[in-house]
Amino acid sequence: MKLNQFARLTPDFKVQVAELKQIGLQADPDDAFSQSATDLFNAFFPEAYTLAAKEDKLAQVAVNMDQTLAAWLAKKPSKMTRRDFYNVALQLLGFEAFTDFDLNDPFKMMTATKLPSLDHDLTSTADLLKAVYLLLNTRTKHLVSYLDDLANRGFLKDFQKKQKKPTHLLFNGKVQQVFDARQAVREVVWIESDMDTDHDGQRDLLEATIYRPKATDQGLKVPVLFTANPYFHGTNDVTAVTHVPETTLAVKTHGASKAEVTANPEEPANLPHHPVNGEATQAEAYAEENSMYAFNDYFLARGFAVVYSAGVGTRYSDGFRTTGGPEETDGAVAVIEWLTGKRRAFTNRTDGITIKAWWSTGLVAMTGKSYLATLAMAAATTGVDGLKTIVADAGISSWYDYYRENGLVVAPGGFQGEDADVLAVDTFSRQKSGGDLINIKQAWEKHLATITHDQDRTTGAYNTWWDARNYRKNANKVKADVVLIHGLNDWNVKPTNAIKFWEAIADLPIQKKLVLHQGQHVYVHNVRSLDFLDMMNLWLTHELLGEANGAEDVLPNVVVQDNVAVQTWSAYQNFASPAAEHVTNTRNLKTDFEAATDQFTDHATATFNAQHDTSASFETAIITPNSAYANSRLWLTQPPLERDQTLEGIPHLELTLAIDAPTGILSVRLIDLGMAKRFGETAATVALNGLQLGFDYKTTDILEFKPTAKPTPSKLISLGHINLQNPKNAYEVQRITPGQPFHISLDLQPTHYHLPAGRQLALVIHGADMAQTIRPIKTTHYQIDLANSSITLPYRI
């Protein structure tokens, strides 16, 4: 086990003492050592209410091989050895003597686990207080810090009773759980937008669900974590509308210019406002939906309000879904504007009674994963006031990069046949209310047909519809600080979405952080080896509470999880830069790779059908040395590596080839070859319900990325797809003459990948990708000019 920690601060001793006193500990350096030790260790068992109960708890802790903590304290000691203190500390952190560590040498385990310690014996009360302060900020076996663990057991439950008025509590630069999340006020309001997406002549009203600390009713104003969640009110069965992958790749007869595919923002309609008949300070509707994001729940107990809005076209709101369109961005912005006092909301949809977010400080962070993170990124590119930061996990920065690639229809990994119209149906939760649906069904079906037409599955080309859903082109407007989290094995929302957004905001005068993990489309807030919750606590305390805690400097710019060394996270200044830390090597496909042939015929669809394969089984087979698809691919290998190497950046392919057809699909996979136990792409549960989100509150599982039980022969590092008629970009078209050579350039997905010595790099070039592209029936023959083809690989040095 490794408990990496990036968010721990080391303030001077006076600050440490003041903070210890603030959380209710006896922390006077002039007190006798024995009295201070007794007071402190007794305080660490808040679940024990009497001295007798505390004595029993102390007797359960071993100081060394000879005595318990209760017996040691009874001797009124005047000092404590470093070894004895950390024997006690480890047990307080949840580790077991004799099982997890040796009482004769706790430091061996602490070093391996990356737990901090003082480097000397405790010979004074000041030493003891320093050790206790560090202990409180040390991570436990249960992922959270020791102070968090104490608070989960009731240590801070009476904090507010001792204050003249409700307040936030900060410790080590981070806000603490001193609010009872069980008592949160739950309410619903309807925010007036500027849009009429269902074309009924009225501004769409957008439902927003609010959970705010009860202390706001006593005058406390709080910042807000806002999650724009289209799934919040449920989803629909999309089996009937999911596309069957087409069997013919269209020959494109004409392309377009950049100007022709550039979307121009539409002027907002001059719609009348909903009438106002009065104002209220209390909502009329209870929030019946439960909060569904553990990250937000964690901060609710720390004095942040949490707001969800599903947006246009969802249950209890007006409008129609647009799958990432400007209307969905505007809907998220409308919620922020209400939270900052710049837009009206109503207590219900009919009476015209307005209500303000009077409990809000007007400082907002947007959070969430996938579609939720996408809307956070979209809102940030508007530059809306009040949005201080986004914490965006696996977000889409351009919807073309989600459903298309280089002129091809490309499904997100794991969802073959999905497209923008399918997702619109999936999230159109208004249809769950029959009384609502009967009034809008015809108009919705007409609207949906427009999406199906405009997404253009025939050519897969980039057009104005997709351009309107490319948030990166407005990245220069971003004013909010940005945290991006992404899985390096996320073939659903592929890594290019994060890295291209990261590059787009690189020169902006904002703070930005990037976390890259080895998972697929998953959260990391409950991964034990990373102190992600503490990192974001430090970040949000700075961003939303205005604490000068140095978060922008303490937290690394880039944190990346290693794919070989277990539970290892490394800090870097940037991704794929600066030049002093990186090098690119261009390798010729003929002289630097071994290949049995330079040509293949793509029979993948026939093989797929004959094998009764699935998308998942195809993805395994296409990168397996001995495969049923061996004749439908080109397999190129490099010699085994003589030393460890780390790929970091965007692999780039230059390829000269000829095909026997006027169009074709080319897929490329970069492979790590060699039998090994590699990480699973989904973190495994290591403690069921082990992460507690607040005192007597919700729990969630603790996870960890682990190597697979059995070795595998290969693993996908990166991939790319291209329509061979689109060698330059996704809108200009090249005519292909069958049998005549032509050239293409292709960027693969960004990666950070550690290749150990002895492994081999392999390059797989094939045609249709059964898991992601369409599935042509017609076979195509590919002839690759290896001598005039190359791949450029980026390395961290």
Swiss-Prot record:
Any Gene Ontology biological process: proteolysis
Catalytic residue positions: 370, 490, 521
InterPro entries named among the record's database cross-references: AB_hydrolase_fold, Galactose-bd-like_sf, Pept_S15_Xpro, PepX_N_dom, PepX_N_dom_sf, Xaa-Pro-like_dom, Xaa-Pro_dipept_C
E.C. no: 3.4.14.11
Complex and partners: Homodimer.
NCBIfam families from the UniProt entry: PRK05371.1-2
Name of the protein this chain belongs to: Xaa-Pro dipeptidyl-peptidase
Source species: Lacticaseibacillus casei (strain BL23) (Lactobacillus casei)
